[in-house]
Regions:
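Charged, amphipathic alpha-helical linker segments immediately N-terminal to NTP-binding catalytic cores
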Residues: 27-74
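Conserved nucleotide-sensing/catalytic segment adjacent to the nucleotide-binding pocket
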Residues: 62-64, 120-125, 130-186
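Pre-Walker A adenine-sensing motif
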Residues: 78-85
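Pre-Walker A (Motif I) flank of P-loop NTPase domains
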Residues: 88-93, 149, 271-272
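Glycine-rich phosphate-binding P-loop
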Residues: 96-111
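Conserved nucleotide-binding/hydrolysis micro-motifs of P-loop NTPases
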Residues: 101, 128-131, 157-161, 169, ...
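A glycine- and Lys/Arg-enriched "phosphate-lid" helix/loop adjacent to the NTP-binding pocket
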Residues: 166-195, 205-257, 304-311
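NTP-dependent small-molecule kinase module
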Residues: 251, 255-260, 264-325
Length: 325
């Protein structure tokens, strides 16, 4: 539940009234929030049609109130991450996928800005290099998994191998897989086996203490166009745009179908996908932060305790310090 009693911990009441411009009672009535993230979770075996799912938020929560809520959630994430790091027996892997310009980089920056860098690592996966092509498609992703006690973020991931490679199957030929030396041989059985490999990989991680959550930022084609134009028009954003972005944009529908099948085949109870409306960046960031916060809380993390003998030693050490001359 989101009310003044919670955000007062972050922002003084005087500043809240100034920013939001409504009374305390009106705020509670207007902005009471239940956990919204469940509606964006893809149930195992569920059919997915992206064109029927929202790309924007049209609810009552206003941007400034949402930002205040996010600050509260980030404090909770930070506390949970401290416990995760201290306990050192579990890890969290967060996967981000999206069409170009959906806001993956900025979402990662905003959601994880409050965590201790020692306990968090981010990997951005680009086109595989020669060494990576010489191994199976999961090899480079396995090498980038978070250690116990850490949060790992994969900006793009092993799913590129059933997304980009599905739209451009000629890329599969670079993997030198026996029996697949021609695009015409890459059939439905090939993709089915690849989905199964991904599910087995993620289940293996789960079985060994790594919780996996997968985020898809669902951007509309119209909003992508506007963001591309912003990158072209703003000199400080020119570096973000490449001509190849328009080539991939022409394959929009092919990518939508590839994503839909990936969600249907790989969203499981233990490793779910979340399809988050991304046209409004502030809302997408809030939902992602809540998903991360909820997931960490579900792990029921605690700071490690000490044995009786260790506690006795602490008492001795305390006495020694206090008696120092």
């Amino acid at each position: 539940m989101f009310g003044f009693d919670q955000i007062e911990k972050i922002v003084p009441l005087s500043l809240q009234n100034k920013q939001i411009g409504i009374s305390r009672v009106a705020f509670k009535k207007k902005y009471s929030m239940k956990d919204e993230t469940a509606q964006y979770r893809v149930s195992s075996g569920k059919k997915v049609k992206l064109s029927k799912l929202p790309t924007t938020y049209s609810g009552k929560l206003e941007k400034e109130a949402g930002k205040l809520k996010m600050e509260e959630v980030k404090l909770s994430i930070n506390k949970s991450q401290e416990k995760l790091y201290a306990s050192g027996n579990r890890s969290l892997l967060i996967i981000f996928q999206a069409m170009d310009a959906a806001g993956k980089d900025s979402a990662i920056e905003h959601v994880m800005s409050g965590v201790n860098p020692q306990g968090c690592q981010v990997y951005n996966f680009k086109t595989p290099n020669e060494e990576e092509y010489a191994h199976d498609f999961l090899w480079r992703h396995y090498r980038a998994l978070p250690e116990k006690g850490r949060i790992g973020i994969h900006n793009r991931s092993h799913y590129e191998n059933v997304l980009v490679c599905k739209v451009h199957p000629e890329y599969i030929l670079k993997e030198n897989i026996p029996g697949y030396d021609q695009v015409s041989k890459i059939d439905n059985d090939f993709w089915k086996a690849r989905y199964e490999s991904i599910k087995s990989f993620e289940q293996h991680l789960t079985n060994n203490g790594t919780t996996v959550i997968k985020i898809f930022l669902h951007l509309s084609k119209e909003e992508q166009k506007q963001r591309f134009l912003d990158r072209i028009n703003d000199p400080e954003k020119n570096w973000k745009f490449a001509g190849g972005d328009l080539v991939e944009r022409k394959a929009w529908e092919d990518y939508q179908r590839a994503y839909e099948q990936a969600f249907e085949e790989t969203s499981t109870e233990s490793c779910p996908w979340y399809i988050i409306p991304a046209d409004k960046k502030w809302y997408a960031r809030l939902m992602i932060s809540k998903i991360v916060d909820n997931t960490l809380k579900e792990l029921k993390l605690e700071f490690p305790g000490l044995e009786d003998k260790e506690l006795e030693n602490l008492s001795t050490y305390k006495t020694q310090l206090l008696e120092e001359k």
